[in-house]
């Protein structure tokens, strides 16, 4: 099993989730806790790296399945399948955050939606209003569906490389997210 599509998704997730979880560093000088700066840097770095890597792993999973499905499905259904896979992976990722940092008094469930791309569109009125009907996962579905459909329309059918589609789909998601 070669993870051909995994790495583009994972690499896209690392800077995205590094930005999302940058707030970990707001407690950086742990002087109030009596630790020196070097030790406090390491105390914060470890959970930051574990969280960013763990969250990026799921975008890598999406990239892997998007790459795999593009070889097995008809071209017309590719945006539908990619959007469905992304929504499923995002839902599983929300559970993972709670499991990763479970402790006494922790809540497990799909309510840890930190970093969901749908939140980047919260300032757009029609998107925000439509979220009451289909939620953040519907917005995620729409983002990936439109992005992958646009890239499919722009890509010639006889383009030789089989490794490009997952990167194209992930790039479409990145463009839509970061152009907000």
Question: Where are the predicted features?
Answer:
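Membrane-embedded alpha-helical bundles of multi-pass enzymes
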Residues: 1-180
């Amino acid at each position: 099993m070669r993870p051909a599509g995994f790495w583009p998704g994972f690499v896209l997730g690392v800077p995205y989730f590094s930005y999302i979880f940058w707030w970990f560093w707001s407690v950086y000088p742990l002087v109030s806790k009596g630790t020196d700066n070097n030790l406090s840097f390491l105390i914060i770095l470890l959970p930051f790296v574990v969280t960013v890597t763990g969250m990026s792993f799921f975008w890598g999973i999406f990239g892997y399945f998007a790459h795999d499905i593009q070889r097995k499905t008809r071209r017309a259904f590719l945006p539908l399948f990619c959007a469905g896979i992304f929504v499923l992976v995002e839902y599983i990722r929300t559970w993972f955050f709670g499991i990763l940092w479970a402790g006494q008094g922790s809540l497990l469930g799909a309510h840890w939606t930190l970093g969901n791309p749908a939140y980047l569109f919260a300032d757009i009125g029609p998107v925000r209003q439509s979220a009451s009907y289909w939620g953040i996962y519907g917005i995620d579905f729409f983002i990936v569906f439109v992005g992958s459909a646009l890239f499919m329309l722009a890509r010639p059918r006889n383009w030789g490389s089989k490794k490009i589609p997952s990167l194209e789909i992930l790039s479409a998601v990145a463009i839509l997210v970061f152009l907000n």
